Amino acid sequence: MKRFWKDVAVAQADGGWAIELDGRPVRTPARAALLLPNRALAEAVAAEWTSVGAEIDPRKMPLTGLANAAIDCVAPEREAFAAGLARYAEADLACYRSDWPPELVERQGACWDPLLAWARRRYDVDFATTSALSHVPQPPATVQCLSHAVAALDPFRLAGLSPLVTIGGSLVAALAVLEEAVPPEDAWAAVSIDERWQLEQWGADDDAEQALQNRKRDFLAAARFLKLLS
């Protein structure tokens, strides 16, 4: 789709902050009003619309995409959406370790142990870790507590949390980013450690490297979305 507007503005409206293109409010793909919960996020979304060139490229508008998802996809099914993310507590990436080679074992421990330690302190839970290939059950109290933490989130925070969880495979790392307990770049380093290790060992493959960079872009965009909500 070609750009059809000249001016972009942020306007306060009933229920939030709207984005206006030449004075007309933006709507989501489902035709709902695109209303943002605070001015900071609204201005960041407006900046994406301002920066659009001759053609609209949704890949360059991640905040808009997450806001659309919050309104169109998450809000109507908030409880079910939260439950889907909470299931990652049953098999968090940080609980599955390599046992060889020693350098990878050390790297995983250096990245993942602090995340689990933070979650233990924050939620008063414990974790079972393993280096086996089979699933290791987590304590029911841990799964329940983390599930409650996710269930308490509003649709916008759930929309922002979702890419962190699904891209990284770690609910613990995603919650740590949400609560600003770890910088997003550090969280990305933790959840991408295995892929980066493989690239180091076997050499860079252009497609694999690009895929990793795309995932990093989406991960950090989601982290920024959450930061703007705080």
Task: Please provide the spans of the model-predicted regions.
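An N-terminal structural lobe/cap that precedes and organizes the functional/catalytic core
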Residues: 1-76
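Short coil/turn segments at secondary-structure boundaries
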Residues: 58-61, 131, 203
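Long, charge-rich low-complexity segments
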Residues: 209-230
